Amino acid sequence: MTGAKYQSLIESSSIQGANADYVEDLYEQFLSDPDSVDAEWRAYFRGVQAPAGAVDVPHSPIRARFAKLARERKLSSAGAAASDARFDARAAEKQAAVLRLINYYRVRGHQAAKLDPLGLAPIAQVQDLDPVFHGLQPEDMDSEFNTGTLAAADRLPLREIIRIVKAVYTDTIGAEYMYITETAQKRWVQKRLEGEVFKPRLSNEQKKDVLTQLAAAEGIERYLHNKYVGQKRFSLEGGDSLIPLLDELMRIAASRGVEDIVIGMAHRGRLNVLVNVLGKSPKDLFAEFEGKYSAESLTRSGDVKYHMGFSTDIEIIGKRLHLVLAFNPSHLEIVNPVVEGSVKARQVRREDDKGDRVVPVLIHGDAAFAGQGVVMETLQLSHSKGYSTGGTVHIIVNNQIGFTTPNPIEVREGHEARTSRYCTDIAKMLEAPVFHVNGDDPEAVVFVTRLAMDFRNEFHKDVIVDLCCYRRHGHNEADEPAATQPVMYEAIRKQPTTYALYAQKLVEQGVIGKDEPELLTRAYRDGLDQGENIARTTLGMVGNQYTVNWANYQKDSWDTPADTSMTLETLQRLAGQMHALPADFTLHPRVLKIYEDRVKMAAGDLPMDWGFAETMAYAGLVQEGFSVRLVGQDTRRGTFFHRHATIHDVKTGANYTPLRHLDADKHRFVVNDTLLSEEGVLGFEYGYSTTDPDSLVIWEAQFGDFVNGAQVVIDQFIASGQAKWGRLCGLTMFLPHGFEGQGPEHSSGRPERFLQLCAGNNMQVCVPSTPAQFFHMIRRQMKRSLRLPLIVMTPKSLLRHKLSVSHLDDLTNGQFQMLIGETEKLDAAKVKRIVFCAGRVYYDLIEARAKQQRADVAIVRIEQLYPFPRANYEAQIAAYPNAKEVLWCQEEPENQGAWYQIKHRLRAYLADDHDLLYATRKGNSTTAVGYLKVHQHEQEEVVRAALDGGLPVRGGA
């Protein structure tokens, strides 16, 4: 490689020589006034500036000086001057070449690092790392050069400079960080990597500790392999260094005053982590393998052992540390936002705004980290308002394969399973540093763990450790991997274990005797034979002032009455506080009208609308000591311009959230407009709600139709978390729902899907039809000693419907009614048909009935579809003894809405002489038509059919 090739490369750069004068002028302008240049150029110039302490100066005076010197050359010997100039130019070019070489090692050294423990991936020949490529020759090796920002002596021989950068960047650690635009962060990483390269990483005692951790990692796997032959355990073998990695992480955390670590991980290595990191009793684990379960666990459906979570307190470096391993399904990476939400709730409880006391740790697989979209959503939340947890430590157990799909560190062109070179490349969007490390070098693993934890502590930012390893067995222990990866598994069969390699190294170093590895292995195995854990000192669940007693939230039943009323004095006082604006605060005229109307509503001069009732529900809860967390993509204003929880000064742009000023603790009310994510955000809120039962956590969809973007969270956590894991959750979901001619993407919150998931009183599905019902439903969610998910089909056009209003005494005297009977004074004896319905269609029905002057049809609203209010329903049937037709009306298609999930309940409590009928749109593969006139015709037909008798149920219900 020659200097000419480097010149060719430079000439193809976007900053090429032809633009040098332009760039030079821009840089001088930047030095004079940084804000005078474009933001992109400003960021670039800051990135190339020298470290703190060195100051760049404008070059134009220097160029002028050189011009003057050139003119004065005529006064000296032309030959001598030319010789000196050539020498100076060569020296300057050599010095520049050395600095370029250092920089290229920082940028591309990771590509030549020895990361693959199997040695299957050939070490890349990166031309930028060849000194000759930069014009440096063998005769330059002993010449001294300035080292620039290299964390070393100011001047060193080129040979020593190359030795340093090779050791730092191309050994068993590959560091990626040069894309970070914050110079302080970049320099910090450089200093730590380069400044400690030849220092001993571990003392002899620490090396022994690491060996002990590896003995435990290997020991549990071999024990289970021999004792429970053929049973799935998703072994960690090949990635054994994860155990000393986590041990070091916890030691550092405890030394810094961290109180809680919440871990999220998939199935790979989970049992190993449970026993050797969290200290789960091996005896309890063996019982799970043998099918022995406690009586309490058999009261629910349960889950497989490698999905189960665990919580405990451990003692490490003389300090107590609370560890949590989150429950999770097999849907890879979906636990990530759940962990972040749980961590956030713990931090808020401790007023830990920076994230110093609670740390999230996420353990990923390489294939899933690169492939699952929720990874990006969770990363994008990391610095979002209301979602930051002070930085997450991400650990990739990179075994270079996903079930049978290869994801090697280096892949042959045309055989890639992903587009990006590394599975970690998505993290670059955060400018998070990535430390790739060879899993068969445990000391390097411990070093990068310290580096990662220190970076997180210093900058409160996400950091990635890519543990490059392999999978010794198949996807599970019964699988045969050699059928699809014959070359890889031939190499794996010959590969000594990490424990064997490290033990041999320590024996050769004289750190341990040659018999010690076998003694460690035997001691660990003997402990397992006794069902004891010798790898971790556990304290059990000690608890502290932040510990939640969840038994207090299982005392009530779903039908336990709750006093959700509010005294008139309290209501009017809170309303006055809520709608008193700061001085000199100018509202938009439309918002001002809403606030002025709410003052009149509180005085009883206007009927109450939905926005007022909702706001007062939150105000009452905050005053009573509960917290409210209301989030969604347009939540502060409300998708339909009805809420205005945060108001804006139209002159200054300042904003103000009245509910945050009801209590001295502003944490009690949080309202956030979130990034455009359903899955990640809903997962976060689920995690938050399962950790803090005293917070009303509400996620609101922009339109209910978009909730299916988070279907995995709904299916695997919200609907089934209690049945599988015994996890209580009071999460509330607001799904704007209603057929109003807006087409198939803005009509339905898919109530049928939620109702299909309902069983065992696992959650509540409600469709409130009045502001007062909304008020009481919200307050009921917190006032009962019960925590169940609440799914609400919320209104759209009803927010301003002239009939959908309430009055003050509805709030001061009422409670949530699971079913609302006929409101007109009908002669019960004359009623021939009872129409049951839910939601917006009720108002179409009563308007049509009034227009037709029908007195033979009673219209009843079922406000809670699940759990089904059987007693209320039976009372309505009994109230109309001559009504032999019971009809269900819904505006959704027949195969959607509540009909298919509710008809058996409607039928079950009818007498033999009752007919069950229905009136719906005809079945459809989509939710709604896209044409307004067709929609209007369909709606009229549904209402007409309901009042006239509908269709009979054929073949029973």
Briefly describe each language-model feature range.
Residues 2, 9-51, 55:
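Subset of Sec-pathway N-terminal targeting signals
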Residues 259-435, 640-692:
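Cofactor-binding active-site loop characterized by glycine-rich and histidine/acidic residues
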